[in-house]
């Protein structure tokens, strides 16, 4: 079972943060567990969460996989992958009809199940559509 995590850019400084997702009074928040290393947490096992407002347009869910370098793969990431000896640059998207993540270049998809990406020879996160939209253009050159 994959860990349910989200990331988004903070409203106050544009920094990417990872954690838990919530909406309250029309605003979007990511909660960061700041209890690690606190003695009270070790005794009572009660996490201390700091909630930070984020830009909802940048909200991305963890896809449950890591790339060849151990980096988490998120919705809206741009990945470089090798399949059957051919290199591709794809975007990770959520597919509502399949209720799963896909890697797509807008023209074709790699399977209806995100786990099919495990058959790729290599997969590496090289950016995301918010910070590096130009990466998707490279596939079509």
Q: Model segments located where?
A:
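Secondary-structure transition motif
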Residues: 1-141
């Amino acid at each position: 079972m994959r860990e349910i995590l989200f990331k988004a850019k903070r409203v106050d400084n544009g920094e990417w943060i990872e954690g838990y997702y919530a909406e309250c009074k029309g605003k979007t928040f990511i909660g960061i567990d700041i209890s690690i290393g606190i003695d009270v947490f070790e005794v009572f096992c009660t996490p201390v969460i700091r909630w930070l407002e984020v830009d909802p347009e940048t909200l991305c869910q963890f896809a449950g996989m890591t790339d060849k370098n151990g980096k988490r793969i998120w919705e809206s990431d741009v990945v470089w992958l090798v399949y059957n000896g051919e290199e591709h640059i794809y975007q990770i998207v959520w597919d509502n009809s399949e209720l799963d993540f896909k890697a797509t270049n807008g023209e074709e998809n790699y399977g209806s199940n995100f786990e099919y990406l495990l058959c790729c020879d290599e997969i590496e996160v090289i950016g995301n559509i918010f910070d590096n939209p130009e990466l998707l253009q490279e596939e079509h050159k």
